[in-house]
Structure formats: C-alpha cells, structure tokens
Amino acid sequence: MTTNANSVTIEKKSYHHGDLRAALIVEGLRLLAEHEADSLSLRELARRVGVSAPSVYRHFPDKEALMTALAEEGLKQLAADQREASDAAGGGEAGFAATGRAYVRFALANPALFRLIFTSPLIARYRRNNPEQPEAMTFLLANAAASAGAEQGSPEARRAAIEAWALVHGLAMLILDGQLPADDAMIDAIC
C-alpha cells in the first residue's frame, strides 16, 4: 500500500478477474492527482489499468458514473482523515478543531478530488441517493453540534454545523483558488 503525494491511500495490486472496478477507482484517483477531473477519460483510464475500453464500461457506463464513484471514495477518505485527526487530538473541542484542519489539509493535498466532491452536481445526486451513507460532512457536522454543546438535530446544532462547515470549506476554497497562501500556521489559527 502506498500514499500518493496527495494523501489518498492507494493499494498497489495488479488487475485480476474480480477487482476491475476497484482497480479503476484506484487508477482514477491517481489520474485526479495528476489532472483536473475534466481531463480524465475512460479510454485513458482503461489504457493505464491495462484493459480494453469496453471492459471499463461494464463497471462505469459513462464518465459521470466513474466521477460519482471517485467522489464517493474521496468522501470516505476525507471522513477517515477527519476521524483519525479527531481521535489523535483526544476528541472533544480539540478533536473538533482537528477535524476542521484535516478538512482543509485534505483539500490542499487533493485539489482535483476535493473540487470534484464539492463543486460538481454529482455529489448532490449522490447524497440524495445515499442519505444513510456516513461521509465527511456528516462527521464534521455531528462534531460541530457536540462542540457547541447542542443536542444533535436541534436548531443550535444545525447553526453550529453550518458555521463550522462554511468556515473550513471557505478557507479551503480561498487557498485552492489562490486568494490566500497555503500556510499551516494560518490553518491552525483559524481552525
């Protein structure tokens, strides 16, 4: 198992019957580490995995299906990063702050994946179709409620959650768009 320069964990496995979908997702994440989502093609993905283009279409009927799967995988990785950061900080308020810093750092380490997750219409459709799926936003929002001392689901918890998410998401986007420098000290101070 390796970690690419953009912090997404990637298992190195050669393709064999039965795991082509997983291999396509892993290679798709690698491609996103190199290029923006718009330039990713199913044909290029097939070439890099070493399979024919038609075999890709058995798992992903179109580019949108692949992008949705990559966004879903990105959300899982972001949620895992946030959980790990919260646990490492000992939970509570320190853990909550750590989840925010993990969110921003994930965005900086995985800019194309982060933009795919949060700026494409795919994620809204994914969330509508998978409301029970745990994901990064759910983790951050639940921690915001706990940190604010509010009962989960209450108006106070919702307000705290939206404020927390807006802060870290806005900071991440400002840095990604070049409006602010990627400065660890600033991220630590704000989050």
Residues covered by each model-derived region:
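N-terminal intrinsically disordered/low-complexity leader segments
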Residues: M1-D19, R30, A89
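Helix-turn-helix
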Residues: A23, E27, L31-A65, A69
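Short hydrophobic clusters on alpha-helical segments that form packing/core surfaces
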Residues: L24-L32, G74, L78, Y103
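Short, hydrophobic secondary-structure boundary micro-motifs
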Residues: S41, R115-I117, R125-Y126, D177, ...
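Amphipathic alpha-helical packing segments from all-alpha helical-bundle domains
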Residues: R125-A150, P155-E163, D188-C191
